[in-house]
Amino acid sequence: MEVLDRRDDEIRDSGNMDSIKSHYVTDSVSEERRSRELKDGDHPLRYKFSIWYTRRTPGVRNQSYEDNIKKMVEFSTVEGFWACYCHLARSSLLPSPTDLHFFKDGIRPLWEDGANCNGGKWIIRFSKVVSARFWEDLLLALVGDQLDDADNICGAVLSVRFNEDIISVWNRNASDHQAVMGLRDSIKRHLKLPHAYVMEYKPHDASLRDNSSYRNTWLRG
C-alpha cells in the first residue's frame, strides 16, 4: 500500500536495510499471533488499535467516503505499535488529500459509527514543517494512555491537505461540555502546544449537516 511503500523508500534511501527486512504487521494479523506476542514477553496496551488510510482522487466528485477507507493494520502491544509505526510514511511524503486514522479497534473512522455519532472532534491546524512531530507525540500519548478520560476518546486523524496538515482527536460525547474542555486541556498539555495555536471543536452531527469535517466549527479555545 502506498502509505507503507513510501516509508520503505525513505528507509531504503537512508541505508537502514534492517528495518526493511523486519516483518510487516498487516491487517491479516491473527489472534494466534497476538497471543504468541504476549507469551513472548511483549507489553500489552490498555486498548487495541487499528490504523486506517483514506486517499481520495482530486477532482473526482461523488466518491464514497466509506468505500475509500482501507484498514491497514491492527495491534495490541507496544512492540506491535512500533512495528507498524516505523513503516508508516511521514506526513511530508503523503499526497494531498490523504487521511490517516488511528482508532480504537472496533470503531470505524466514520461520523455515523455508533461510538462516534454523538461525539465530535478537536481540530488543530499545523504547517507541514511541524505536523509530523505533533502527530507522533499525539500517537504516543494515545498508545501510552496519557490523555485524560481515555475511555471517552475514540481515535485521532491526520489529514494531509495542500497547504496545511490537520490533526483531530475524536471523542464520544459532544454534549458533555466539561469532558470536551477537559480533553482540550489534556491535548494542549501533552503536545506542549504553543499559545499561538487555536483549537477548534466540531460535533459530528454538524459535520453530517454541512458535509464538512473542518469548516464551520462552533467552539474555539
UniProtKB/Swiss-Prot annotation:
Presence of keyword Cytoplasm: no
Example GO BP: response to virus
N-terminal signal peptide: none
GO MF, one annotated term: translation initiation factor activity
Annotated Pfam families: IF4E
Transmembrane parts of this sequence: none
Annotated InterPro entries: TIF_eIF4e-like, TIF_eIF_4E, TIF_eIF_4E_CS
Gene3D superfamilies: RNA Cap, Translation Initiation Factor Eif4e
Gene Ontology cellular-component terms listed: cytoplasm
SUPFAM superfamilies reported in the protein's UniProt record: eIF4e-like
Keywords for the protein's UniProt record, in alphabetical order: Initiation factor, Protein biosynthesis, RNA-binding, Translation regulation
Superkingdom of the organism of origin: Eukaryota
Assembly and interaction partners: EIF4F is a multi-subunit complex, the composition of which varies with external and internal environmental conditions. It is composed of at least EIF4A, EIF4E and EIF4G. EIF4E is also known to interact with other partners. In higher plants two isoforms of EIF4F have been identified, named isoform EIF4F and isoform EIF(iso)4F. Isoform EIF4F has subunits p220 and p26, whereas isoform EIF(iso)4F has subunits p82 and p28.
Function: Recognizes and binds the 7-methylguanosine-containing mRNA cap during an early step in the initiation of protein synthesis and facilitates ribosome binding by inducing the unwinding of the mRNAs secondary structures.
Stated family: Belongs to the eukaryotic initiation factor 4E family.
Protein name per its UniProtKB record: Eukaryotic translation initiation factor NCBP
Name of encoding gene: NCBP
